[in-house]
Amino acid sequence: METIIASGIAVLGTLLGSGLTLAFQQRATDRTHEFTRREKLRQERLDAYSVYAGALINYRRALVHLWFCEHEQPPPEDPDAVRVRAYDLRSAAQEALFRVQMLTADEELGRAAEAVLAEVTAVHKTDSRPEFVERRVRTRDGIAHLINTAKQHL
C-alpha cells in the first residue's frame, strides 16, 4: 500500500512540475511575442514618421522652387515642369500621411500631420515675398514640431 501511495505522490509531483513548467514557458513566450509586436510597431512608426517628414521636406522644397520660378525674372526653370514635379511630391507626401495616420493611435498627431501638409501646400500661394518668407519659416517650424511630437509616440 505504501508503494502505491508513494507512486501516486510521485506521479502527482511530476504532473504538477510539468504543469508549472508549461505555465512559465507560456508566460515567457507571451511576453516575448508581445515585446516583438511592440518593437515591430515602433519600428514601423519610426519608418512612417521619417518617410513622411522627408516627403514633406521634398514637397516644400519643390514648392519653394516653384515660387521662385513663377516670380523671378528670368525664371531659373520652366514653372510647368516644376509644378508637375511638385504634384508628384504631393502625392508621395499624401501616401506617407496615410501611413502615419494608420500607424498612430493618437488622433491629434494624425490631425497635426495633416495640418502641416496643408500649410506646406499653401507655401507658394502668395505674390508677396515677405508673406512667402513667413510661410517658409512657419512650414519649416511646423515640420520640426511635428517631428518632435512624433518622437514621443515611438
Tell what function each PLM region has.
Residues G19-L154:
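Conserved non-transmembrane functional hotspots
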Residues M1-V11:
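Feature marks short, highly hydrophobic, charge-poor N-terminal signal-anchor/signal peptide-like helices
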Residues A10, T14-T21:
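Acidic, low-complexity proline/glycine-rich segments
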